[in-house]
A protein has these predicted regions:
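An acidic-aromatic pocket/loop used at catalytic or ligand-binding sites
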Residues: 23-186
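Bacterial N-terminal signal peptides that target proteins for export
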Residues: 1-10
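An exposure/low-complexity boundary signal
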Residues: 2, 20-23
Length: 186
């Protein structure tokens, strides 16, 4: 009996062990986002279950009009499990301040590699980030107030991406959006 299970059991065990560092890293990132949600000056605007995506567009450059269509100057298309969160930042705190705290933790605690960052006008059009990239029109703010960070975590075969976007329409309307994409391993 044992010999018939062994060929099936060993590859499954090896697969699970190879994904263990990714699961730990992803779990830590989700814990970090949960810490954000639990802060008293944060109100959740949108949070859905993880969804499987194919060829999800990750911006690695400013959004600009190229041959009549809005798109990032540089990008990558990735597939995997995507989790999105959008929060409104309240009580005099700024979305940029919260973004910088999260970014600092990603770099310190997870050795996240920054693949692209922009602030203000260097990001391009805020309305395009809100509508085309994140499909959250509530994120539309002034171009000068926006910030975006794209991070890579993990190693080939067990990677994830974390995207952070902060915007502000006014002092009272500050928003932060986060996306975590756990990549397929093929």
């Amino acid at each position: 009996m044992r010999t018939t299970l062994f060929p099936w059991y060993l590859p499954l065990t090896l697969l699970l062990l190879s994904r263990a560092p990714l699961a730990a890293e992803a779990g830590g990132v989700f814990d970090l986002l949960e810490e954000v949600r639990q802060r008293p000056h944060v109100e959740t605007v949108a949070a859905g279950p993880a969804e499987t995506v194919r060829d999800h567009l990750v911006g690695l450059g400013a959004i600009e009009k190229i041959r009549g269509a809005w798109s990032p100057r540089d990008s990558e298309r990735l597939s995997g499990e995507l989790t999105r969160r959008t929060w409104r930042i309240l009580d005099g705190f700024s979305s940029a301040e919260v973004l910088e705290r999260i970014a600092g933790r990603l770099e310190q605690d997870f050795a996240a590699q920054l693949t692209f960052a922009c602030e203000g006008y260097s990001c391009g059009s805020s309305v395009q980030w809100a509508n085309r990239m994140f499909r959250q029109r509530i994120l539309y703010g002034t171009d000068v107030s926006q910030r975006y960070r794209a991070y890579r975590l993990g190693e080939a075969g067990s990677e994830l991406r974390v995207l952070l976007y902060a915007s502000a329409r006014s002092a009272e309307r500050q928003y932060l959006h986060a996306e975590v994409l756990v990549l397929d391993d093929h």
